Amino acid sequence: MRHRCNVPQLGRPADQRKALLRSLTTEIIRNGTVTTTKARAKAVRSEVERMVTLAKDGSLAARRQALGYIYDKQLVHLLFEQAPERYAKRQGGYTRILRTVRRRGDNAEMAIIELT
């Protein structure tokens, strides 16, 4: 039972939710920006921040953790090369969520999440 677990459910079972967050994280790191729903953007923000923090650490253990989470191996190597100098003076807050127009079909709140 999930008593008082504050995990955003996103209307999916746990395995599908984990796969969704992994794929969104991979695409944000690859493209720098993704348009998605506001709830998904808020949920994926912590995962992206965690991956950038691992990349700033740069250790072998951190690299292996990132390889286990991000789907693209070359993307992990690129992240570990670029993140330490790009975010050297920043202690978190690597992403930004911008609200945008609602989705036409179901009027869902949409947002753009991007790396800063």
Curated annotation (Swiss-Prot):
GO molecular function: structural constituent of ribosome
Gene3D superfamilies referenced in this protein's UniProt entry, alphabetically: Ribosomal protein L17
Protein name per UniProt: Large ribosomal subunit protein bL17
Recorded GO CC terms: cytosolic large ribosomal subunit
InterPro entries: Ribosomal_bL17, Ribosomal_bL17_sf
Quaternary structure annotation from Swiss-Prot or TrEMBL: Part of the 50S ribosomal subunit. Contacts protein L32.
Record's keyword annotation contains Coiled coil: no
Keywords: Ribonucleoprotein, Ribosomal protein
Keyword Ribonucleoprotein carried by entry: yes
Any one GO BP annotation for this protein: translation
Assigned protein family: Belongs to the bacterial ribosomal protein bL17 family.
